């Protein structure tokens, strides 16, 4: 609200969610979450110092960047979860208090398996963000058409049966992550449901299936090895990672732009082995 633009609000929300996701994934069962505003009594107005809360959430965000987005620690230390010049501290504290009441890991799916948070987040990107940013993301229906036209589902079955692995998928301009998310959903559904009967029955394939698609609450483990996304826009790269997690995956390799603008943070040198 106020003088804060829609794009700034969107990125602030993304970064706060990333910090909360990291906190939920890494906090021990016997420890309290750091992503919250602590109270010293039953009085809701008796809250901790806002600056101390901001510093703690900011540290969470920086840890999330290095752990989940492959950001070098030196660069992460220079970044802030929310720019206080664009959004006042009182608004940041209010946002944290609102988000702390929800679990983004446990509460992700509905009873019928629908990724409610993922669908909600994608709708924000598709219907709101693009209009203010001037970026146009490919509609989900077109993405699905392209994936099926490329016969990614059949190729996945063929690769597992013949080579005991999946195809490698890379989106060099990942945008909001829609291609990667739909690839992930389609491949997982193909292997586990639609074409499961087409998998060969032998120990190697059973082991590959169990290692990469089981248990059901972590059925996208395979993405860690086979899905890659690159996005030069650092903030949008962060949004992709959040989008992937909210749609059921925290494993995909997402690389966002660095100072060189190449979007490939871990790589310094490239060796061309052949012309293929």
Model-predicted segments: where are they?
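Accessory nucleic-acid engagement/destabilization modules that flank
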Residues: 1-29, 33
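Class I SAM-dependent transferase core
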Residues: 118-148, 152
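Short amphipathic alpha-helical segments and their helix-coil junctions
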Residues: 1-4, 97-104, 169
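Long recognition/docking surfaces used for binding and targeting
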Residues: 18, 25-129
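Conserved S-adenosyl-L-methionine
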Residues: 139-273
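Non-catalytic, well-ordered alpha-helical scaffold segments
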Residues: 7-16, 93, 114, 118, ...
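Short, charged/polar micro-motifs that form catalytic or ligand-binding hotspots
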Residues: 3-8, 106-110, 132-136, 230
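Short, intrinsically disordered, charge-balanced linker/junction segments flanking boundaries
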Residues: 1, 272-276
């Amino acid at each position: 609200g106020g003088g804060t633009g829609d794009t700034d609000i969107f990125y602030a929300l993304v970064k706060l969610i990333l910090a909360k996701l990291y906190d939920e994934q890494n906090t021990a069962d016997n420890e309290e979450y750091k992503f919250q505003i602590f109270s010293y009594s039953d009085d809701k107005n008796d809250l901790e110092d806002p600056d101390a809360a901001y510093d703690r959430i900011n540290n969470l965000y920086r840890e999330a960047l290095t752990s989940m987005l492959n950001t070098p620690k030196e660069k992460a230390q220079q970044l802030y979860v929310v720019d206080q010049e664009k959004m006042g501290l009182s608004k940041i504290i209010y946002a944290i208090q609102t988000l702390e009441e929800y679990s983004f890991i446990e509460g992700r799916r509905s009873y019928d398996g629908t990724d409610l948070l993922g669908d909600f987040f994608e709708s924000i990107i598709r219907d709101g963000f693009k209009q203010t940013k001037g970026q146009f993301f490919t509609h989900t229906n077109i993405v699905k058409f392209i994936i099926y036209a490329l016969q990614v589902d059949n190729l996945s079955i063929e690769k597992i049966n013949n080579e005991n692995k999946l195809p490698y998928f890379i989106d060099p301009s990942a945008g909001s992550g829609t291609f990667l998310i739909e690839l992930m959903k389609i491949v997982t559904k193909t292997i586990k449901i639609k074409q499961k009967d087409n998998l060969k029955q032998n120990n190697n394939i059973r082991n590959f299936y169990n290692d990469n698609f089981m248990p059901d609450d972590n059925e996208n483990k395979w993405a860690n090895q086979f899905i890659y996304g690159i996005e030069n826009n650092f903030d949008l790269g962060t949004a992709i990672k959040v989008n992937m997690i909210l749609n059921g995956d925290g494993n995909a390799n997402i690389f966002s732009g660095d100072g060189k603008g190449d979007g490939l943070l871990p790589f310094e040198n490239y060796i061309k082995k052949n012309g293929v």
